[in-house]
Amino acid sequence: GLCGVPQNLVLALRDSGVKGLTCVSNNAGVDGAGLGLLLESRQIDKMIASYVGENKLFEKQYLDGTIEVELNPQGTMAERMRAGGAGIPAFFTPTGYGTPLTAGKEARQFDGRWHVLETALHADISLIKAWKADEDGNLTYRMTARNFNPPMAEAGRVTVAEVEEIVPVGAIDPHMVHTPGIYVDRIVVGENQEKVIERRKTREG
């Protein structure tokens, strides 16, 4: 999906020409948008993701052996991000036990149920898309963009947020602050905030 993608930051990363990236995202983008842009320029060496089926280029690179993939169930990946931000090095979860996704991982029984050990996720740089930021870096997200952005903001050693607007301190209701500014290192106002639609459907009149 493309909801909550910091498209301008992805474009800047592409234009930088940096190679050998390990990307953490719930998906691999689509052709021509999101992380699909970095796949086109062959800047990604490894993807940690939950779903990669929308991108034909990713499939080709994986089958060619030019990109590595680490698949995680979505809930597990979200918790790995949250653990990284909270300073929790690892946790046990029953999700995925006995499947190829967890082969080779430590397993233990709790209350008669098997669990596997998952480690926290950290990022050298977290690229985040938020709706608004105030001048102290407090972020608020719109609707489903409040998915993986908040936990990934906390899991980054450096967090850069692309926003649609920067407002004065106090303009965001405290109850609407989804990511406190303590986690945010840089704020960028994105240009040309076009909503990319994966499958545009219109009613025939």
Predicted features and spans:
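Conserved alpha/beta enzyme-core scaffold
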Residues: G1-G205
